[in-house]
Amino acid sequence: MDGIKYAVFTEKSIRLLGNNQYTSNVESGSTRAEIKHWIELFFGVKVIAMNSHRLPVPGKGRRMGPLMGHRMHYRRMIITLQPGYSIPPLIEKRT
């Protein structure tokens, strides 16, 4: 589960849980096929649809001595499961 970072709990994502849709942030370099494979393999569920978008806020700049770097950019995935399947709640990232 290297590509999946953490579950997202917002008003919209909690509302989508009623439609059997789960929201999580993933690494921007991960493909849809990889994410689908990881979720089906790890949780034992069937994925029927996946929607994704890049978060509008770019990675925050961070200085490391004379070099300027940036934090990782993330992509948000909304994963729709077949009826009858569910994912146990993932651990929420503390900020």
From Swiss-Prot:
Q: Name one GO cellular component term.
A: chloroplast
Xref: InterPro entries? Nucleotide-bd_a/b_plait_sf, Ribosomal_uL23-like, Ribosomal_uL23/eL15/eS24_sf, Ribosomal_uL23_CS
The processes (GO biological process) annotated in the record are:
translation
Q: Which domain of life is it from?
A: Eukaryota
Main subcellular location: plastid
Q: Where in the cell is it found?
A: Plastid, Chloroplast
Record SUPFAM superfamilies: Ribosomal proteins S24e, L23 and L15e
Q: Name one Pfam family in it.
A: Ribosomal_L23
Q: Report whether Plastid shows up as a keyword of the record.
A: yes
The alphabetized UniProt keywords are: Chloroplast, Plastid, Ribonucleoprotein, Ribosomal protein, RNA-binding, rRNA-binding
Question: Which Gene Ontology molecular function entries are recorded, alphabetically?
Answer: rRNA binding; structural constituent of ribosome
HAMAP family referenced in this protein's UniProt entry, alphabetically: Ribosomal_uL23_B (MF_01369_B)
The subunit structure is: Part of the 50S ribosomal subunit.
Spell out the family assignment given in the record's similarity comment.
Belongs to the universal ribosomal protein uL23 family.
Q: What does this protein do?
A: Binds to 23S rRNA.
Q: What is this protein called?
A: Large ribosomal subunit protein uL23cz/uL23cy
Instruction: Print the organism lineage.
Output: Eukaryota, Viridiplantae, Streptophyta, Embryophyta, Tracheophyta
